[in-house]
Curated annotation (Swiss-Prot):
Gene3D superfamilies: Knottin, scorpion toxin-like (3.30.30.10). Belongs to the long (4 C-C) scorpion toxin superfamily. Sodium channel inhibitor family. Beta subfamily. Has the structural arrangement of an alpha-helix connected to antiparallel beta-sheets by disulfide bonds (CS-alpha/beta). CDD domains: neurotoxins_LC_scorpion. This is Neurotoxin Cex5. GO terms for biological process: defense response. Expressed by the venom gland. One of its GO terms (cellular component) is extracellular region. One of its GO terms (molecular function) is sodium channel inhibitor activity. Keywords: Amidation, Disulfide bond, Ion channel impairing toxin, Neurotoxin, Secreted, Signal, Toxin, Voltage-gated sodium channel impairing toxin. Pfam families: Toxin_3. Its main location: secreted.
Amino acid sequence: AKDGYLVSKSTGCKYECFWLGKNEGCDKECKAPNQGGGYGYCHAFACWCENLPESTPTYPIPGKSCGKK
C-alpha cells in the first residue's frame, strides 16, 4: 500500500479541499471503490489518502501537469 494525493486521471489535478484535517469529502473519495484507500483527509488544500493500492494513481501523473503547459 502507499499514501499520496488523490489525482484526477483525466486532468492530472489533485482533488481540492478547503476544510483542513478531517474531511468527509476526502475520506469518501479515498474510500471510493475506484480508489480503494483506507483513510482520507485534507492536507495543504488537497485530499491526501492513506493505504491506497499500488495500482491507484497519485499526484503527479507523468505527462499530465494539471492545466499547466
